[in-house]
Amino acid sequence: SKNEFGLISLLHFDGFLRVLLSLMILDFIGAYLAHYVQHKIKPLWLVHVVHHSDRYVDTTTANRHHPIESFVRFIFTVFAVFVSESSIAIVFLYQSLSVVFSQFNHANIELNSHFDKVMSYLVVTPRMHKVHHHSYMPYTDTNYGNIFSIWDRLFGTYSELDKDKIIYGTDDNYDDKNDFFKVLKRPFKKD
């Protein structure tokens, strides 16, 4: 017999709606909420700042994470799997989409501004996410989304800024010179 314990079973969704709602729950808890919490809890921010310290945001930035951050995101994702009661196939689909969107969000590509604006009502676009990589507040604490942009709009964390005004990196001008071990030690350095 099948154990039904998640939100999807309570709502009795099947087929496409089940897949879509599962993806949305996984994205909300496993990406948006995890990302938001990493910005709000100082020890987690000290780990996440490794990602933000990149002064040249591109697709490599999407892969620039401290191993501790990967563990934190894993915990949130596992919780999201239980809440959504997602099948392994849906989890694989979500993880695949997450990787694609993370690369897309950090890519140095410029979409037609009208198309970008329309697209950003549904999904996170590079222009939208790059505001999040601005080195100064309040922009750093906006646009947390990974796949769906609805979360930032719904929770008031959406922000726009002209791309020419964005300065990448962190406000402390930390420069790791791409030294792998220096990057790994960054969360533990004394100020």
Roles of regions detected by a PLM:
Residues 165-191:
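A membrane-cytosol interface segment of integral membrane proteins
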Residues 1, 8-9, 13-167:
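Membrane-embedded catalytic scaffold of the fatty acid hydroxylase/desaturase
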